[in-house]
Amino acid sequence: MLGFLLLTFLTVYAFVAALLATTRLRYGSRAETLLTACLLWNFIILLPIHALGVAGVLYRSTLGWSSFLISSAVIGASFARVDSWEGFLREGWQTAHDVARLPFEALTISFQRRSLVFVGLVAVLSVLSWTAWMAYLAPSDAWDGIWYHETMIGYAIQNHGYATMHLPMNLTQQANGYPRNCEMTGLWFVIFTDRRLVELPNSLMAVATADSHCSGLVTSRCT
């Protein structure tokens, strides 16, 4: 339970940092704001993972503290040279509020206008919510997950970094040279807890991307 609480705190804290940094960019579109915040959040959690992984000191404790410090640094940088800290906090809160309302407004407006976009939104959000729930309930049995995705995650945790894995000289060597951003995002969700959330990032990022793109089709008022 403590592991899940720590994961929740660090994940939310990193997203708050990303959202505050995105607020400084002042996008006119809420969809763009959401996508940018998700990308920055991903960067914030991947930066310490890659740095610690290359150094061979990727432990739960080092990652937790590194992530906290990086998120704090991003939050601090977001407040740099603002006219009023209180005013910027209100602006950040408004940004979070607007982004949170985006999917609900998209559904409401598309329904009121009897738009086919409503059907698409409901279908996409339902499928992605279902797959996120199933990712938690059932282990992955897809060929690529067992082949190299989860292999890379497991060995990175076991070896406390990106040490070369001693695998047969066949296609399993992909686990030694494949790009790691997706896998290390998955590592973020399991290193503090267990493997139940290893496939969750796929659904989370897909929800943000699909919601932003579909919502942008409804009306400029939603974005």
Go through each PLM region and give its residues.
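Loop-to-transmembrane boundary segments
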Residues: 103-123
